[in-house]
Amino acid sequence: AHFLPPLUL
């Protein structure tokens, strides 16, 4: 999943 601040999990 992508979140802000940019994190790719």
From Swiss-Prot:
Compartments, as annotated in UniProt: Secreted
Keywords: Antimicrobial, Secreted, Selenocysteine
Chain segments annotated as transmembrane: none
Tissue-specific expression: Expressed by the venom gland.
GO cellular component, one term: extracellular region
Zinc as UniProt keyword: no
Keyword Secreted: yes
Functional description taken from the UniProt entry: May have antimicrobial properties, like most ant linear peptides.
Record protein name field: U1-poneritoxin-Dq2b
Annotated organism of origin: Dinoponera quadriceps (South American ant)
Organism classification: Eukaryota, Metazoa, Ecdysozoa, Arthropoda, Hexapoda
